[in-house]
Amino acid sequence: FYEPRQKHWAMTERRARDLQTSSSMLKIGPSSMSFDGESLTVDLDERSAPFRRAIRGKVVIDIPAHTDRCYALHSAGEHRWWPIAPTARVKVSLDAPSVRWEGAGYVDTNGGTVALEDTFTDWHWSRADMGPENCRIVYEAHARDGETCLMTLFGGPKTGMASEHSPPRRDLSVGPIWRVSRPARSYQGFNVEKTLEDTPFYT
């Protein structure tokens, strides 16, 4: 969660015994995620890194419709990506920190039989809202064997996602602290208004 003067980031390692799953629920430690067929509800009870501030509250993502297609990221078939809800509505209600917000959102998932870093040297993703029910997504990944995955999709959960010609490469400036490259694609070009995350592995 990003606020004007601070951010709240949690990525807590848990033991296998802390995991519970069912067809509609995922629980890891004190936090859980459940789906009722139309809404994904996330109940959070975590601590941020590195200062251990509380992150506690609820996030509800309305998903009245979803896409039904997964995309292969490599010809070997070991990796797939599914833009489940290219457009969605999100409601954030946190007690700690005190945050209330509603707006546009997105849900996707990556899956595979081997780790992403075993196959790919890097991967890049961007998404732009194109109205209340549509968006445009660019997904690009470069494999260690020289293969490249590049796809540009337009649409939404009700109409599905249609392939488009990919925009030309127009890289963002490198990250301000760790200097990680930020490849991107756009017809118009762009400026960096704010860098939300700048780490050695994700910028």
Regions found by a protein language model. Name each.
Residues 1-203:
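Structured soluble/peripheral alpha/beta segments that form catalytic or ligand/cofactor-binding pockets
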